[in-house]
Design a protein with these regions (language model features):
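Domain-scale activation on soluble regions of proteins
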Residues: 1-299
Length: 299
């Protein structure tokens, strides 16, 4: 089905290539899904690292509480996306048939715990005395318990209309950073060597959400007044998208292009849903049904 799009600016096209563009971005996949997923995982992880270090360093020094709180959602999405991509890159190293790949991805979808279980099965690996193997299983299990479908950090509530943070929660950015780095390093090492690393890491509980830490190295979420509001999520993705855009333009970080696009795409979806639920004349119950029906669609 074709659509007659009305662009904000004239002569715009998603497929337009301007040879005179000051900041050209070239995207070329290798054709090998394992290699391509590995590269995308690296890009998303790098973007997440850039954001968390900015928050923990420059933003913390400026006592910019708003950024520390709001940017959490986009940052954790970038980290989670990197884990899903590196996990699937490992699976695609073993499974090379297109049919089998589709079947496995359809089975595990976005569930990191199921993906890890499948990877262990495919590689004939078992839980051993290796602390990293067991820690990672517990960590990914905790993520799946909270965010099985990769939705809970994108929207103020899930398809069941339940909120993730039903009370004010002070999340440690340091613990989040350390745990995400450990998980990513373990999966990257498995991809590179075929074995689980014996490296020792900073010890934190294998949990996605760990409270505590220095006040200006925390993200505080779950404010009651914004419990079901789209604003914090919309602002998070839009502002982090702008931040990554500036890094691309000013520091030539072209590898952040795809993560930036995801930030903007999510912001557009959230902005549209915000209008439907919070600013339209549609009765709230009907508006929520529209959201459930549309899922991730922006059309």
């Amino acid at each position: 089905m074709g659509y007659d799009f009305k662009w904000i600016q004239p002569n715009m096209s998603l497929y337009n290539v301007n040879p005179n563009c000051q900041y050209p971005i070239s995207i070329l996949n290798s054709g090998n899904l394992a290699i391509d997923f590995y590269k995308y995982a690296k890009d998303f992880f790098g973007a997440a690292e850039c954001v968390v270090h900015y928050l923990g360093e420059e933003v913390a020094v400026k006592y910019d509480i708003a950024k520390l709180d709001i940017w959490y959602f986009a940052m954790i999405y970038l980290y989670r996306q990197s884990l899903e991509l590196i996990l699937k890159a490992n699976i695609f190293q073993v499974v090379v048939s297109d049919g089998e790949r589709k079947e496995i991805i359809g089975e595990i979808r976005h569930d990191l715990k199921q993906g890890y279980d499948k990877l262990l099965e495919l590689k004939n690996l078992e839980f051993t005395e290796n602390n990293n193997t067991n820690w990672l299983w517990e960590f990914l299990t905790d993520i799946s318990r909270i965010d099985r479908e990769s939705d809970m950090f994108r929207y103020p509530f899930g398809n069941n209309l339940k909120v993730l943070f039903d009370k004010q929660t002070h999340i440690s950015l340091v613990a989040t950073h350390d745990n995400m780095n450990r998980a990513y390093d373990i999966l990257r090492g498995l991809y590179d060597t075929g074995n689980f690393s014996e490296q020792e890491y900073e010890i934190h509980l294998p949990q996605l959400i760990i409270e505590g830490g220095d006040y200006y190295q925390q993200s505080v979420v779950g404010y009651k007044y914004a419990e079901r509001s789209f604003y914090p999520y919309y602002s998070s993705y839009e502002e982090v998208g702008n931040f990554l855009r500036d890094k691309i333009l000013e520091d030539n970080k072209k590898e952040y292009f795809m993560p930036m696009c995801y930030m903007y795409r999510n912001a557009v979806e959230l902005g549209l849903k915000r209008i439907i639920v919070e600013s339209s004349h549609i009765e709230r119950a009907k508006a929520l049904k529209v959201l459930q029906k549309k899922k991730h669609s922006i059309l």
